[in-house]
C-alpha cells in the first residue's frame, strides 16, 4: 500500500516535470511570461495614477527596471549551491523607496545549506545583514528573518570579518537561517557613496568552496524564473503605485496612514521610514522642518509617483546627515521646489510636479519623529 502511494507520487511528479519541460520547449512558458508583463502594465494604467506623459513614461520604464533586476536575481544568479553577491538596485534599477546612499548586495540562498560571508568592512556609516524567507521583497514569503548589525559583530582592527549563516548556532558572527530562508540582503549606508570605500565581500556555501561548477540551465529552472519575474514585476509595480495613490490623499503632509503591510515586513528593524506626497504648483515650495533624532544616520530623498528615487546623479534630490546644513539649534529645514530658491537644503524636483518625499532615521533604539510641512510661495523664500 505504501509502495503504491509512493509510486503514484513519483509518477505525478514526473508528469508535472514533463509538462513544465514541454511548456518551455513549445514556447508556452515564454508566452505566459509575456502575458504577465502585459498584465503588469495595467498597474501603470490603474485608476488614481497620473496620466501625464512624464509619469506614464517613467511608470513603464519602471517595469523594465524591475524586470531587469529580477532576471538577474531569479534567473542569472539563482543558484543557492553556488551563491554570488550581486547588486541589482542602483542608479538605473530601482525598487520602492530605495536609499540613494545605500550600496545593496544580495544572494540566493537555501536554508538547508550553511554559508560563509567574509571580507573587509569598508567605510560605510552603517551596515546590516538581513535574511529573507520566500521569494523576497515583492515575491511573497514571511519577510525579514534574522538580522545582524555592526554593534553585535566582531570586526578585526584591520576591518576584516566573517559571518556564518546556518540553522545551528555558530560562535562569532552568526545569522540563524530557517528551512525556508531563500535570500540575503546586505545594506551598506554611506555618507558619501562615491567618495568612501565600499566593503569587499565574498560568499561561499560551506562544504563546497567552489569544488563543483554550477549546473547548466534546466527547463524547470527557466520556467520557475520566468514565473517569479513576471509576478514580481507586477506585484512590486503595484506596491509603489498603490502606496503613492493612498499617500496622495494627504498631500504635502507626512503621515503613516498609507503604510503597506507588505513592504513593512521586509524592512530592517533599525530603519524608521516616513513619506509625504508632494503636489506643488510651478511657483510653490514645500518646506519640511524637523529636529532629526539621535541616530547613526539620517537622510531625506525625493521620489517620483512610482516611488523611485529621482535622478540623484544629476540633481540634488537627496541629502543626509553629512551633506545637509543644520540650524544652530540642531533642526533642519528642507525646501522642495521646482527651481533653486537660493536657500540651503534645496531638493530639486527634477521636473516632477508631484511625487513623494521620504525621510529615514537609522540605528538602534531611535526615537521616531515625523517632520512638519507647509506649502509656501517660492517668492517668500527669496
Residues covered by each model-derived region:
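A compositional/structural signature for long, glycine/proline-rich flexible linkers
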Residues: 2-382
